[in-house]
Structure formats: structure tokens, C-alpha cells
Amino acid sequence: VATVDCSDYPKPACTLEYMPLCGSDNQTYSNKCSFCNAVVDSNGTLTLSHFGKC
């Protein structure tokens, strides 16, 4: 199972680097920061499906 450490999040702003991750909601997040912010917003219900686009 792929995991991402989101312990340093949320962050107020994310960089624009493009390293896509696919969330358990079947949405592609552009990078770890945007994914981790969404994980925090979901109260931990969002998980990583896999690295790369959904």
C-alpha cells in the first residue's frame, strides 16, 4: 500500500510542481501538498490510492 506522510500539513500555500497522486476519492492531486491538504480537510478519510494520475 502506498502511503504519504502528511504530518507536516496543512500548509497555507502549495508549490506548483507537478507530481500527481491519485486519492481514494478517485481525484488526481497535482502534488503531495495539495493531496495532504485535502487529507487534513477530510479528517483523515481520504487516503492515497496510488502515485500518478487516476
UniProtKB/Swiss-Prot annotation:
Keyword Glycoprotein listed: yes
Major site of localization recorded for this protein: secreted
Site-annotated residues for Reactive bond 3: 16-17
Compartments (UniProt record): Secreted
Keyword field contains DNA repair: no
Glycosylation sites: 43
Domain notes: Avian ovomucoid consists of three homologous, tandem Kazal family inhibitory domains.
Protein name, as recorded: Ovomucoid
Source organism of this protein record: Chauna chavaria (Northern screamer)
